[in-house]
């Protein structure tokens, strides 16, 4: 503000004194307490009455912590890229991707997202149940889908209205001026659930794309592999419908090794069958030779 006033005065533009602001009469937003946030029970109830699209958004928001703006900016291409470490190089069509991952239950997708608020990219992840829900929703889409198509086909206004409808149907009421069940509350759920599951606040901030100060941003860089490993350790905290206490989330490399091992086992089995056939033919041939020798 001082810079603006200095600019005007420098060019001899008269600036009237502004009235002083009385902090006592400013309407401040009501504080949000932990007990007022939706817990897993509430989120499960919301999930049960939601449309397939909103089911996908709810699970994605809870497990990724993405803000509404970033959620709506994601494309099909972004989603395929987030799944790429689990896919062969030639899988680029979204329906091929969904078919390929149909029987894989431990996919933790990695999103590189540009946060509009800070204009910086950050990494976050979403849970296997969110991936399943997104895939189920995409299979119901009736419009042609390209890499540039939005991942969630919904406008900002309709998304807000959908959250409001769920909130009012469940009778969840309001927290201050806002309804209790809304997208920003799911972002708060994500942060609080991870923090209360003993994830460090720095890691939580990294997953939510919150800005570091310039010095920290320049000198302290998060290792993506370590961040994903840390996220997987706390995955049960942000998983809503699935019991993941005993879920073994395997690395893509290990999954690939398992698949290659299955192929090798199949090939070895085929080779053994061929050897058995050759042994049988050899015995038959020796029998014929012996009979011919005895006859002569």
Predicted feature residues:
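Non-catalytic DNA-binding core/recognition domains of DNA-processing enzymes
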Residues: 1-13, 126
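Short, basic (Lys/Arg/His-rich) helix/loop patches that form interaction surfaces
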Residues: 142-149, 161-206, 210-213
């Amino acid at each position: 503000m001082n810079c603006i006033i200095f600019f005007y005065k420098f060019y001899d533009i008269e600036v009237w004194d502004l009235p002083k602001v009385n902090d006592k009469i400013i309407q401040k937003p009501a504080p949000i307490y932990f007990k007022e946030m939706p817990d897993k029970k509430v989120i499960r109830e919301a999930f049960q009455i939601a449309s397939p699209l909103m089911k996908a958004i709810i699970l994605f928001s809870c497990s990724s912590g993405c803000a509404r703006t970033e959620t709506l900016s994601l494309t099909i291409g972004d989603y395929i890229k987030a799944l790429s470490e689990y896919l062969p190089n030639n899988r680029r069509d979204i329906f091929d991707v969904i078919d390929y991952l149909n029987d894989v239950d431990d996919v933790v997708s990695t999103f590189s997202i540009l946060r509009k608020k800070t204009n910086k990219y950050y990494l976050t992840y979403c849970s296997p149940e969110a991936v399943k829900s997104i895939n189920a929703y995409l299979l119901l889409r009736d419009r042609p889908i390209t890499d540039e198509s939005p991942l969630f086909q919904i406008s900002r206004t309709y998304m807000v209205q959908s959250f409001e409808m769920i909130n009012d149907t469940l009778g969840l009421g309001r927290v201050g001026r806002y309804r209790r069940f809304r997208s920003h509350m799911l972002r708060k759920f994500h942060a609080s659930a991870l923090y209360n599951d003993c994830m460090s606040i720095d890691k939580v901030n990294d997953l939510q794309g919150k800005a570091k100060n310039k010095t920290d941003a320049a000198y302290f860089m998060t290792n993506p592999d370590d961040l994903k490993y840390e996220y997987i350790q706390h995955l049960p905290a942000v998983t809503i419908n699935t019991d993941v206490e005993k879920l073994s989330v395997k690395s893509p490399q290990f999954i690939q090794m398992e698949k290659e091992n299955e192929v090798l086992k199949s090939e070895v089995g085929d080779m053994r069958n061929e050897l058995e056939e050759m042994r049988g033919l050899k015995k038959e041939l020796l029998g014929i030779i012996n009979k011919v020798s005895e006859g002569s």
